[in-house]
Amino acid sequence: MRFDAADAHWRETPRPGASGAQKDWLTRGGSLTAHLARLGRVTVRVTREAVATPWADERGALACAPRAPVWVREVVLAVDGTPFVAAHSIAPLAASKGVWQAMRRLRTRPLAELLYSDPEVTRSALVSRRVIAGHPLFALASHALSPGHATPHAFAARRSVFERRGTPLMVTECMLPALWRHLDAHGERRARDFEGA
């Protein structure tokens, strides 16, 4: 079976109003953690690991029933201490004890270590959308913001489905305003390149 994260809201082409940096980062393949590492020191803070039910827009992508249990891992990826990305990953509960059991043992290591080191893992196309209040991802991203920063009207997010031995693991990544501010100010240069300047 081919798993696909696209639907009426999640599309392969970023929305027309997206900035150049947003279009680039929403469609950029490879490891997001590795791309962030070009900007500075990346740390992973795990905010949730639990059994849950999939969000409404996740069920179709994973071909699972509405109340089917899934294993959820949520993290915040920070660069030099500033939160840049809130990520939400899910796999069928049985798979989290089988094919994808390694995701339960990552702790503060990035999921990329698991996904990009295994030749058996394939990835669907990246899809993206604008996330506004009412979507559970909006709440997740809002909680990940640095203290004192106002919540934006919307967030840019992307997702894709990784497959191993016919079993899916979906990763959704929500870009936080600090990422766009950094790119606007410095481009892709590492933050420490500016220290002592």
From Swiss-Prot:
GO terms for molecular function: chorismate lyase activity. Substrate binds at R73, L111, E173. Pathway: Cofactor biosynthesis; ubiquinone biosynthesis. Keywords: Cytoplasm, Lyase, Pyruvate, Ubiquinone biosynthesis. It comes from the Bacteria. Residues 1-14 have a biased composition (Basic and acidic residues). Belongs to the UbiC family. Removes the pyruvyl group from chorismate, with concomitant aromatization of the ring, to provide 4-hydroxybenzoate (4HB) for the ubiquinone pathway. This is Probable chorismate pyruvate-lyase. It comes from Burkholderia thailandensis (strain ATCC 700388 / DSM 13276 / CCUG 48851 / CIP 106301 / E264).
